């Protein structure tokens, strides 16, 4: 309903409005809240609101939110199969949205393989 009224919406973490600093867990919680309200939130919509949607909500979409040339490149590389259960679930994914949905609902810190800040690798999981 909020989106229908053209309100800018972003999904992010800051603990004040959620329960975790982990973006994947926040996406999972947003999905559950939408379900409880009788609304649907697809994996693609969730990813949008966590990236470009969030940048637009903060009026930073000229600098952040996607991989367009000239934008700041702060991003994480995710391992969709970080745990045995996730690997099993990903084997049964019916497509990219299903794979993203599984990551969104089962993911946590273990899925972060690498972190880049301004395009420079800042962290790699051992």
Enumerate the predicted regions with their spans:
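His/Asp/Glu-enriched, well-ordered alpha-helical/loop segment
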Residues: 1-87
């Amino acid at each position: 309903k909020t989106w229908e009224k053209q309100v800018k919406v972003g999904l992010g973490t800051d603990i004040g409005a959620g329960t975790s600093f982990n973006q994947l867990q926040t996406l999972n919680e947003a999905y559950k809240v939408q379900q409880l309200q009788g609304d649907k939130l697809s994996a693609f919509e969730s990813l949008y609101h966590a990236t470009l949607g969030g940048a637009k909500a903060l009026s930073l979409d000229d600098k952040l939110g996607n991989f367009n040339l000239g934008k700041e490149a702060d991003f994480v590389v995710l391992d969709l199969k970080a745990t045995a259960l996730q690997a099993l679930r990903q084997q049964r994914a019916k497509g990219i949205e299903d794979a993203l949905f599984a990551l969104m609902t089962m993911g946590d810190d273990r899925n972060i393989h690498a972190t880049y800040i301004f395009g420079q690798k800042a962290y790699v999981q051992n």
